[in-house]
Amino acid sequence: MSFLFGGAPKMSSEQKIAAAETEVEMITDMFNRLSESCSKKCIPNDYREGDLNKGESVCLDRCVGKFFEVNIKVSEKMQGVAGQQQGGAGLSL
């Protein structure tokens, strides 16, 4: 009943494993979306060299930076919305 007083409820080992697996899936999905999006934007389909040139490297660096900035902003916004919903739910008792 610690969750009634602000503490997190105890999780069993199975729940912890399931939560960790979900987190790994989310991170893998984010990495795949990042790779696909930035590669599509920054690397041409006709490869001319074996290595990235300076323009491609700079483009990828900026793309990854923007991707993480947006990801952080969206996460913060969603946490704020979730907090408001939890706060509002407690007041309606």
Curated annotation (Swiss-Prot):
PANTHER family to which the protein is assigned, alphabetical: MITOCHONDRIAL IMPORT INNER MEMBRANE TRANSLOCASE SUBUNIT TIM10 (PTHR11038:SF16)
Subunit structure: Heterohexamer; composed of 3 copies of TIM9 and 3 copies of TIM10, named soluble 70 kDa complex. Associates directly with the TIM22 complex, whose core is composed of TIM22 and TIM54. Interacts with the transmembrane regions of multi-pass transmembrane proteins in transit.
Lineage: Eukaryota, Fungi, Dikarya, Ascomycota, Pezizomycotina
Bridged cysteine pairs (disulfide): C38-C63, C42-C59
GO molecular function: metal ion binding; protein transporter activity; unfolded protein binding
Full protein name: Mitochondrial import inner membrane translocase subunit tim10
Entry's localization field: Mitochondrion inner membrane
Membrane topology recorded in Swiss-Prot or TrEMBL: Peripheral membrane protein
